[in-house]
Amino acid sequence: MATDSASCEPDLSRAPGDAEGATAEAAKKEFDVDTLSKSELRMLLSVMEGELEARDLVIEALRARRKEVFIQERYGRFNLNDPFLALQRDYEAGAGDKEKPVCTNPLSILEAVMAHCRKMQERMSAQLAAAESRQKKLEMEKLQLQALEQEHKKLAAHLEEERGKNKHVVLMLVKECKQLSGKVVEEAQKLEEVMVKLEEEKKKTSELEDQLSAEKQRSAGMEAQLEKQLFEFDTEREQLRAKLTREEAHTTDLKEEIDKMKKMMEQMKKGNDGKPGLSLPRKTKDKRLASISVATEGPVTRSVACQTDVVTESTDPVKKLPLSVPIKPSTGSPLVSTNTKGNVGPSALLIRPGIDRQASHSDLGPSPPTALPSSASRIEENGPSAGNAPDLSNSTPSTPSGTAPAAAQTLGAAPQNHSQAPPVHSLHSPCANTHPGLNPRIQAARFRFQGNANDPDQNGNNTQSPPSRDVSPTSRDNLVAKQLARNTVTQALSRFTSPQAGASSRLGASPGGDAGTCPPVGRTGLKTPGAARVDRGNPPPIPPKKPGLSQTPSPPHPQLRASNAGAKVDNKIVASPPSTLPQGTKVVNEENVPKSSSPQLPPKPSIDLTVASAGCPVSALATSQVGAWPAETPGLNQPACTDSSLVIPTTVAFRSSINPVSASSRSPGASDSLLVTASGWSPSLTPLLMSGGPAPLAGRPTLLQQAAAQGNVTLLSMLLNEEGLDINYCCEDSHSALYSAAKNGHTDCVRLLLNAEARVDAADKNGFTPLCVAAAQGHFECIELLTAYNANINHSAAGGQTPLYLACKTGNKECIKLLLEAGTDRSIKTRDGWTPIHAAVDTGNVDSLKLLMYHRVPAPGNSLSAEEPKSGLFSLNGGESPPGSSKPVVPADLINHADKEGWTAAHIAASKGFKNCLEILCRHGGLEPERRDKCNRTVHDVATDDCKHLLENLNALKIPLRISVGEIQPSNDGSDDFECEHTICTLNIRKQTSWEDFSKAVSQALTNHFQAISSDGCWGLEDGTLNNTTDSCIGLGTSSIQSIMLGSIPWSTGQSFSQSPWDFMKKKKVEQVTVLLSGPQEGCLSSVTYTSMIPLQMLQNYLRLVEQYHNVIFHGPEGSLQDYIANQLALCMKHRQMAAGFPCEIVRAEVDSGFSKEQLVDVFISNACLIPVKQFPVKKKIIVILENLEKSSLSELLGDFLAPLENRSTESPCTFQKGNGTSECYYFHENCFLLGTLAKACLQGSDLLVQQHFRWVQLRWDCEPSQGLLQRFLRRKAVSKFRGQLPAPCDPVCKIVDWVISVWRQLNSCLARLGTPEALLGPKYFLSCPVVPGHAQATVKWMSKLWNAIIAPRVQEAILSRAAMNKQPGARQTASKKHPSQGQQAVVRAALSILLNKAILHGCPLPRTELDQQIADFKGGSFPLSIVSSYSKKKGESAAWRKVNTSPRKKPGHFSSPMWNKPDLKHEGMRNKSVPHLNINRSSSLSKQQSLENDLSMTLTLDHRLSLGSDDEADLVKELQSMCSSKSESDISKIADSREDLRTFDSSRTNPVTSAPVNLRMPVPQKEASPLSSHQTTECSNSKSKTELGVSRVKSFLPVPRSKVAQCSQNTKRSSSSSSNTRQLEINNNSKEENWNVDKHEHVEKRNK
C-alpha cells in the first residue's frame, strides 16, 4: 500500500504543474484554435488523449486507496485499546451536523477535478471536429477549382485546334472536290475506252478459242492418223525385213540341200537293193524343210524352211512363208485355230516382235549347205498335186491355213534371249554312216511310242511326217520301203556327227522355222514317220489385211497317238485322262488308219486332247505342267511367270558355243521319249551335253531337269523314285533341277526336290542359287520353301547380287518381305557398290523401299500377325503413313552408302525423278543430301525440277501459325461456341530464310487468312487473289496484332535475332508461332472481331454510340449475339477508362419475368448510378448491362427512368422509394453507362414509348453484321479443320457448310413471309455446327437436334401466338397456346412441313439414301394431304385455297388426313383416352428435346372433321399458300423442280404411303379441280405397291380444300398426290395400310406378323 501511494503521488503532483506550464506557454503564443494547422491539431489531440489516460489512472489509484484513506482519517488518531479514545470516537460519530470531521473529504475534490476535465475534453473535441470539416470543405473546393481551370484550358485549346482543323478541312474538301470532279470526267472517258477495248478483246478471244478448239481437234486427228500409219509402216518394215532375210537364207539353204542330195543319191545307189535306195533320197529331201528364223534380225540370221512351210516354185521358193504379226489369243481366229497337239497356246502369239533385237540365231554358217531341187513340187490348198521331181510321186499335202499362220505369229517370240544361238540341228534325220555302239535299249524302245506309218489324212493321202522321221515317202507304193528304212535307222545316228541344219519337231512348232528362239513344247514330235494327219477340214482364208501372211496352208500337225487307257512308260502304266481346259480346241482323229504292210507294232489309239487357248502346256499324264521354259539369260532379267502371259516357245535355240549332238539323242526310240509322251517335249529345256563326235541320248538327269523346268510333278516324282539318280546333276550352265524348278516357279517340284535332299544352295556358273533365281523371278512361294530348308539368304552371286538385291530389282514386295523376315542382311553390297536400297530406288518401287527401311523382323516366337500392328508402318497398296509414326530400321550409313561412282540412293532417285522414293529417303533423319559424288555433285545438282523443289523443302521446319484471342471466360453471352486459337497455315522455314523473309511470310499469311475467311466469294481462293488490299473486309490486318510468340519467346514484326530463324526455331524447339490479337484488355476490338466475325468497323461504331449516348439497347432476333456484343463493348470501355486513370466497374443484371422496378432501383443506387441530389457525382465510371429485357415489359421496368436518363443532372431529379420504404431524390450522373440487350426483332405496343429515349442498335438477320457472320464463322472453322487451307469448292465440307448457311437464311426468309418475326433466329444457334471432314452425317444429325429442340417449338409458339393474338387477347392467350384449336393445329403442321421442305431439307448435299435415313429424326414435319371442309364453304375462296397444293395440276377429291383420322368413337373411344397423342418420338434424343416434342405433339391430335374457323387462321393459311406458290423470293427461288430434290419424311417409318410429293412449280387454277376418275383410282394401287416396295415418294403436307363435287365419293377418303402433271393418285380407304388411327403401330405390327 505504501508503495502504491508513493508511485501515484508524483503523478498527482506533476499533473497540475504540466497544465499550468502549458497554459502559460499558450498564453505567450496567443493560443487560437482556429489558426492551428492540421498537424498541430493532431498533436493537441494526442496530448489530450494522453491526459485522459493519465486521469483514468489517477482515478483508479484513488479508488483503490479510498477505503484505506477513510479508515486512516476516521480512526487513525485513536488507539483501539484505550476506552477513553473509543468513547471519544463514538462521540464524534454521533455528533450533529454542526460538528464536522477534522480533515476535508478528498473524494469531493477528485470529483470536482473530473467534472472540470470532462468539460474541457468536450469543448476541445467540438473545436477539432469543426476544424476538420472546414479543412475538408476547403480541400474539396480547391480540387474542384483546379479541375475546372484545367478543363477550361483544355477546352479552350481544343476549341482553337478544332477551329484550325475545320478551316483546314474545309479548304482541303473544296480542293478535293475540284480534283475529284475532274478525275470523274477523266475516269468516265477512260472507262468508256476500256469497255470498248474489252468488248473487242472478248470478241477476239472467243474467235481465238474457237479456232484453237478446231485446231486441237484437227491436230488430235492428225496425230492419231500419223501414229496409226507409223505403226503400220513399222509392222510392214519388220515383216518385209524378216521375209527378205528368210528368203535369202532359204535360197542359200536350198542350194546346199541340192548339193547334199546329189551326194546322198550317189551313196544310195551304192546300196545292195533298190528299195532302201528309194527311201534315202526322199529322206534327205525332207531336210530342206527345217527352218529357223528371227523376225527382227539382219543378215547375220539364217533360216531353213520347215517341212510344214509351203514351198513354191524355184523362182520364188519362200514367197508364201508367213510373217509374224502379234495378235490377241482367240479360239475363233482363223490365225490361231489349230494350236493342237503341240501345247503351243495362243499366248505365244502375244510376245511383241521387237523387244530385244539381240536374240538371234547368229551362227548358222558351219552347217553344210543343203539345197532343194529347183523343180520342187507345188502344194495346192486342198490336196496334193503332181510334182516335177523324179523321185517324188506326191508333194507334201497341205494343211488348214490356220496352222501355219498360227505358228508363224510367233516369229521372234523369244526376244529375251541375250545369247547367240547356233543353228538348230536335225535331231532325227538319217545319215549314210552308221554308229556301231548304239545302245540296244534305245533300239528296243524305238517302236514303243510309234504310230502306224500308213495313217492317211483327211483327203486320203498319206501325211508327210516331220523331219524327225527316219524315212518320209509320200505315196502308197513306198510302204515297204518305209518299213525297211526304219530298220536301217541306226545308219542315221552317225549323221549328226557332222554339223548340219536339222528339222525341228513338227508338232512342237508348227512351222518351227518362223518361231524365233523359243523351244517347242509338243509331245508328238518323235512320232513314227507314218503318223496320221489331223482331220481339220478346209481352212478359212487368211484376212487380206495381214501383210505377208501366206494364204496357202501348210501341212497339218501329225496325229497324236497314245493309248486311251494309259501310256506305257518303261513297263509302267500311267493314267492319261484327256485334258479339258476352257476355250480349248478339241482334236479328234476321225479316220482309222490302215496298218503297215510289214509286221510292226499295232497302231496306238489316239487321245482326244483339248489344247487350252490360254497357251499352257497340258500334261498327258497328270496335267501338272504349269508354265513354259523361258529363254535363259545369265543376268536373270526375265521373270518367268510374273506379270505376263505364259510364253510357249515354238522352236529350238541353243548357244553358239554348243556343238551338234548325235541323232540318237533325239531319236524316236530314245529314253527321253518318256518325257515326250508324258508331258510334251521341249528340246531347248536341256542344253546339249556333249560337243563333237557321237554322243549318247539324254539320260535320266536330263529328263529330271526337263520335268522340273516344265513343272511335271508326275514325271518328276517317278524319276525321283528311281535308284541311283543324281538329283544334283547340273547341265553345262550349271543349272540343277532345283534351279530350273525355282526359276519357273514350280512350287510342287521345288518341294519334291527339297524333300529328296537336293542341294539347296547349288549355284550356276554365274553364282546364282535357286533362291537367287526365285527372288529374281518373283516366286515368293518358292522363296518360302527354300528359306524353310535353310537356304543361304545372304548368298552373293558372281556380281555380288544377293536374293534381297534381286528381289528389289524385280520389285516383288512379297519376296522382299519374306527375305526380310528370314533375317537377310540389308547392307550387303554388289561388285559395283550397290545395296538393295540402290536397287529398289533404281526401279522406282516405293513399296520395296518402304519395306527395306521400315519393316522390322518379328521377334522370335511372335507370329507375323502379332507383329503386323507394330510393323505395319505403311500400307503396301500405296498408302502412306503419316510422318513420324514410325522409325526406320536401317542406319544412316546404309542410306548414305555410295557406289563406285559416289552415288547414293538419293542421287539415283533424284536423277531419275522418283519423287516418292526421294521423299521416303528424306524422312530418314540421317540422310546427307549434301554428300557429293566423284564428280563433286550433290543430290540437288543431279535432281530433276520436282525433286529439286522437294530437296529445297527437305530441311524446312514446318511450324504451324496460330491466331490466339486470349482466354474466353465461360458466360451466358453466347461465347461458348467460340474457340481461343485457330491454325491458319504452316510456315516453311528453310536454312536460308532470314528474319525479314520470316516477317513477310507471317504478315502475308495473316493477310491472306483474314481475306480468305471474310471473302463472300466462292471457296478455294488462291493466295494470289488475296493480296490486293492490306486489310480484309472485316477490318483485320497486320495492325491488329498485339504480339507474336515464337513458342514462349515474344517477337515483333521486323525484329531480328543473332541466329537465323531456322537455327533459332531448331535450338529453342519452337513448336508453333502464335499471333495474339489486340483485345478489350488493350482497349481494342480486333480479337472480338476475329472471335465473333463481326466487322471491326461496326464494333467501333457501336462503341462510339455507347460513349456518345450513354444509353444504348441492342435488339434483334434471338441468337443475334446481343449479350456478347454488349459485354465485349463494356469490357473494352472499362480497360480504356482504367488506362486513362479513371476507375471503372461493370455491373450485370439479368432480367427475368420476376424482375421488378424496385430491384432495378436498388441496383442503380447500390452501384452509385443513382446518387442523391445533395451529393456530388463520383469520378468512378459505372457500366450497367441489363440482359434479357424481352422477358419484362420495357414500359413498366424503365418508364420511371426515362427522363433522368435522358437529362443527367440535378435539375431533373426523380424520387425513388428504397426497399426499406424510405424515399429520396436521385439523379443519374454522367459517368454512368446503360447497355441493354433485347431478343426481339421489333417492338410492339407500349414498349414503343421507350424507344425514343434510348439509342437502338438493330441486329437484323438480313443485314450486317448478322447476314454474313455465320458464313465467315463456318468458313474459318473449316479452314482451321484443314490446317489453314481453304478446302476445294467440290469438297463435301464446303457443300455441307453452304447448306447450313442456306438453311438459316431460307428459314428466316420463310418465317418473315409467314408474319412470325418472333420466331426468327440469329446465327448463334448455328455456330455450333460440327465441321468434320468426311462426316456430313454428323452435321445433318446436329441439324435434326437443332430442329427438334429450338426451331420447331419456336415456330409452333409463334404461329399459335399470332393466331390467338386477336381472338383471345390477354390472359386467355396462354390458355390458347396450351389448347389450340384444330384449325390452329393444322396451320402449325402445315407450316412445319413447309419449313422443313423449303428451308431445311432443300439443298442437303447428302445422297438420297443417306438422307432418307436421317429424315426420321426431324420431328413434327409430317403433314399429309388433308382439307378443312368448312373453309371452302365459309370463305368461298377455293381458288385461293388451291395455292396451298404445291403439286401441279392437282385434281382434289374428298380428302381426309390419314395421319389425323379420328377413329370410330364406338370402337376406339377408350383407346383414344389411353393414347393421348401420336408417338412422334420414335428415335432417341435428349430429354429436353423429348419434352419439347411431346408438348408439340400433344397439340397435333386432330379430328378428321377439323376446320379453320377464324379469320386469323385463314390469313395464316393464305401466307402459307403464297409462300409455297411464290417463286419471287430470292431465298426460296432455287426450289428444285425434280422429285429427287424434295425429301420424304413421315412420322411413322412403317407407313410410307401416307404422304405425297410437294412440287413447288405452279399453283393450280380452280377450273382444274375435278373429281378423281376411276382411271386415277386404279393407278393408286400401282403407286401403293411401288411405295411399299421401297420406292421413296416425296410428300406434300399442305392442307388441301375439299371440292364440293368430290363429297359424293365416300369410298375415297385417302389420297396421295403424285408429281405427275396429268393425274393424281388416290389411295383406297379400304386397305389396311391406309387406315390410320392413333394406335396405327399396332396395326402395322399385326400386318408385319
From Swiss-Prot:
<dbReference type="GO" id="GO:0017124">
    <property type="term" value="F:SH3 domain binding"/>
</dbReference>
<feature type="region of interest" description="Disordered">
    <location>
        <begin position="322"/>
        <end position="439"/>
    </location>
</feature>
<keyword id="KW-0597">Phosphoprotein</keyword>
<feature type="compositionally biased region" description="Basic and acidic residues">
    <location>
        <begin position="1528"/>
        <end position="1546"/>
    </location>
</feature>
<keyword id="KW-0966">Cell projection</keyword>
<feature type="repeat" description="ANK 2">
    <location>
        <begin position="733"/>
        <end position="762"/>
    </location>
</feature>
<dbReference type="Pfam" id="PF09727">
    <property type="entry name" value="CortBP2"/>
</dbReference>
<dbReference type="GO" id="GO:0098871">
    <property type="term" value="C:postsynaptic actin cytoskeleton"/>
</dbReference>
<keyword id="KW-0677">Repeat</keyword>
<feature type="region of interest" description="Disordered">
    <location>
        <begin position="1527"/>
        <end position="1649"/>
    </location>
</feature>
<dbReference type="Pfam" id="PF12796">
    <property type="entry name" value="Ank_2"/>
</dbReference>
<dbReference type="InterPro" id="IPR036770">
    <property type="entry name" value="Ankyrin_rpt-contain_sf"/>
</dbReference>
<feature type="repeat" description="ANK 3">
    <location>
        <begin position="766"/>
        <end position="795"/>
    </location>
</feature>
<dbReference type="Pfam" id="PF25408">
    <property type="entry name" value="AAA_lid_NAV1"/>
</dbReference>
<feature type="region of interest" description="Disordered">
    <location>
        <begin position="451"/>
        <end position="476"/>
    </location>
</feature>
<feature type="region of interest" description="Disordered">
    <location>
        <begin position="1"/>
        <end position="27"/>
    </location>
</feature>
<dbReference type="GO" id="GO:0050807">
    <property type="term" value="P:regulation of synapse organization"/>
</dbReference>
<keyword id="KW-0770">Synapse</keyword>
<dbReference type="GO" id="GO:0008021">
    <property type="term" value="C:synaptic vesicle"/>
</dbReference>
<feature type="compositionally biased region" description="Polar residues">
    <location>
        <begin position="492"/>
        <end position="503"/>
    </location>
</feature>
<dbReference type="GO" id="GO:0098978">
    <property type="term" value="C:glutamatergic synapse"/>
</dbReference>
<feature type="compositionally biased region" description="Low complexity">
    <location>
        <begin position="395"/>
        <end position="416"/>
    </location>
</feature>
<comment type="subunit">
    <text>Interacts with CTTN/cortactin SH3 domain. Interacts with STRN, STRN4/zinedin and MOB4/phocein; this interactions mediate the association with the STRIPAK core complex and may regulate dendritic spine distribution of the STRIPAK complex in hippocampal neurons. Activation of glutamate receptors weakens the interaction with STRN and STRN4.</text>
</comment>
<dbReference type="GO" id="GO:1905274">
    <property type="term" value="P:regulation of modification of postsynaptic actin cytoskeleton"/>
</dbReference>
<feature type="compositionally biased region" description="Polar residues">
    <location>
        <begin position="1621"/>
        <end position="1630"/>
    </location>
</feature>
<keyword id="KW-0040">ANK repeat</keyword>
<keyword id="KW-0175">Coiled coil</keyword>
<feature type="modified residue" description="Asymmetric dimethylarginine">
    <location>
        <position position="495"/>
    </location>
</feature>
<feature type="repeat" description="ANK 4">
    <location>
        <begin position="799"/>
        <end position="828"/>
    </location>
</feature>
<feature type="repeat" description="ANK 6">
    <location>
        <begin position="901"/>
        <end position="931"/>
    </location>
</feature>
<feature type="region of interest" description="Disordered">
    <location>
        <begin position="1438"/>
        <end position="1471"/>
    </location>
</feature>
<dbReference type="GO" id="GO:0090443">
    <property type="term" value="C:FAR/SIN/STRIPAK complex"/>
</dbReference>
<dbReference type="GO" id="GO:0005938">
    <property type="term" value="C:cell cortex"/>
</dbReference>
<feature type="coiled-coil region">
    <location>
        <begin position="118"/>
        <end position="275"/>
    </location>
</feature>
<feature type="compositionally biased region" description="Polar residues">
    <location>
        <begin position="330"/>
        <end position="342"/>
    </location>
</feature>
<feature type="compositionally biased region" description="Polar residues">
    <location>
        <begin position="1571"/>
        <end position="1584"/>
    </location>
</feature>
<protein>
    <recommendedName>
        <fullName>Cortactin-binding protein 2</fullName>
    </recommendedName>
</protein>
<feature type="repeat" description="ANK 5">
    <location>
        <begin position="832"/>
        <end position="861"/>
    </location>
</feature>
<dbReference type="InterPro" id="IPR050889">
    <property type="entry name" value="Dendritic_Spine_Reg/Scaffold"/>
</dbReference>
<feature type="compositionally biased region" description="Polar residues">
    <location>
        <begin position="1547"/>
        <end position="1557"/>
    </location>
</feature>
<feature type="region of interest" description="Disordered">
    <location>
        <begin position="492"/>
        <end position="604"/>
    </location>
</feature>
<feature type="compositionally biased region" description="Basic and acidic residues">
    <location>
        <begin position="1631"/>
        <end position="1649"/>
    </location>
</feature>
